[in-house]
Curated annotation (Swiss-Prot):
Protein name per the record: Inosine/xanthosine triphosphatase
Keywords: Hydrolase, Magnesium, Manganese, Metal-binding, Nucleotide metabolism, Nucleotide-binding
Organism in which the protein naturally occurs: Salmonella agona (strain SL483)
Subunit structure: Homodimer.
PANTHER family per the UniProt record, alphabetical: NON-CANONICAL PURINE NTP PHOSPHATASE_PRRC1 DOMAIN-CONTAINING PROTEIN, PTHR34699
Gene3D superfamilies: 3.90.950.10
Source organism phylogeny: Bacteria, Pseudomonadati, Pseudomonadota, Gammaproteobacteria, Enterobacterales
Name of the coding gene: yjjX
Annotated binding of Mg(2+), by residue: E38, Q68
Family: Belongs to the YjjX NTPase family.
Cofactor(s) required, per the database record: Mg(2+); Mn(2+)
Length: 171
């Protein structure tokens, strides 16, 4: 059984990690341990580079806390131009897989507040009345009318980031 350290305690992200690992390695093939670690970037990262750095930092910090694990996984959400997206970073001590998620364009009413220094999650909670929306369906769930959720979009990015770990051509 793979010991997987999730560099987040966010249920939406943990669900995506678990589903993706079970899709690739088989049901019941892994045990997820969530840990809260620092990203080293602002609460609301801006741009692909800063967001990716946050995910990389979380993986490195999780690995320092739990060096005995088989995998360390981080999902860092950010804002790039007028959209939200995330970077997924997965490490197994030998190689690293990284993938960027799909992007969701955000309306100006939301972006204006985020650009003024507020994090997307609290802005969306205020807008929707849903407490801790970032730990649930997220802006993705709201603006796609539930057709996608934060977790479902992250799931795809985790699957992509896992590609180097089960395809020999990457080695």
């Amino acid at each position: 059984m793979h010991q997987v350290i999730s560099a987040t305690t966010n249920p939406a992200k943990i669900q995506a990690i678990l589903q993706a690992f079970e899709e690739i390695f088989g049901e019941g093939s892994c045990h997820i341990t969530p840990v809260a670690v620092e990203s080293g970037v602002p609460e609301q990262p801006f741009g692909s580079e800063e967001t990716r750095a946050g995910a990389r930092n979380r993986v490195d910090n999780a690995r320092r806390l739990h060096p005995q694990a088989d995998f360390w996984v981080a999902i860092e959400a950010g804002i790039d131009d007028d959209a939200t997206f995330s970077w997924v970073v997965i490490d197994n001590g030998v190689q690293r897989g990284e993938a960027r998620s799909a992007t969701l364009p955000l309306p100006a009413v939301i972006l204006d507040r985020v650009r003024q220094g507020e994090a997307l999650g609290p802005v969306m909670s205020h807008y929707t009345g849903i407490d801790e929306i970032g730990r649930k369906e997220g802006a993705i769930g709201v603006f796609t009318a539930g057709k996608l959720t934060r977790s479902s979009v992250y799931y795809q990015a985790v699957i992509l980031a896992l590609s180097p770990f089960h395809n020999a051509v990457y080695r």
